[in-house]
Amino acid sequence: LDQEVLDTQPDEVETLLIVLKEIDVKTALSKSKLRELDYSLNPYYGCQFSCLYCYARKFTPHEEASDRWGEVIVVKRNLVEVLLKEVQRVRRGTVGLSTITDPYQPVEGSRLLTRRSLEILLSKDFRVSIQTKSPLVLRDLDVLVRHRERVDVGFTVTTLREEVWRRLEPGAPGPKARIEALKRLSGEGIDTWLFMGPVIRGMNDGEVRDIIVLAGEIGTRIVYDKFNEYGISLGLRGDKGWWEAKEREILRSCEEVGIECHSEVEDWIHEERRRFLPLF
């Protein structure tokens, strides 16, 4: 990594003991159930960021990575070879990188599965939508800039407060590092977005205005979502009336700041607009 990327790394992230395992896979691309994506690609099972609210744990097919979330990371060692074959025969479309892991978690620094997959997909005229919490994505800035018309990058920003970040996302880079990386990407002309979620009542819901203002300063759009349990309990209780009021506040704030804003559920509409650009 160059010094600029190193300078955006978190200074004090909780250090967790990680067990790395390797497997061979038969497929690289999976049909996505999200309307805005055609495929998903997950280079790893498990995630070192260990976010307490993460739904991916429930949908991770590798039992040990799911049961020991944040401790066991499974590397798909033959992913690149499999992907090279798949892109020759599947229909081109939009690939989500990634949907049940963070593609730029620390193990990617040495394994390079995300970078190599990104190069393959973009060279074959697929579109790629990246979502991460890590400024390690800046390592691949050369690839992203070269193919900027076919890629977008979203950063999850759940909170701006250190105490909330450390509680909810103990292994993830801090919000400052994410925001600086988002600024850099946006400044390079890459389509960026800020995922403000999950919005959790009594924990980070008082920060939505501040995060929206920050997105406005960067010049990026907002995608938002509330906390959905998916079998995960944080000891919190939702309230339909609370969320309806909070969503109105989010939309009003985005309008006042002058940025595009939509819910996670509506994200497919934005992607449909992109589809009017030629895929071939």
Q: Where in the sequence are the language-model features?
A:
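Active-site beta-loop-alpha junctions enriched in small/polar residues
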Residues: 100-102, 133-135, 156-160, 197-199, ...
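A general structural detector for well-ordered alpha-helical segments in enzyme core domains, enriched
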Residues: 79-83, 113-117, 140, 177-182, ...
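Conserved Radical SAM active-site core
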Residues: 6-152, 162-163, 175
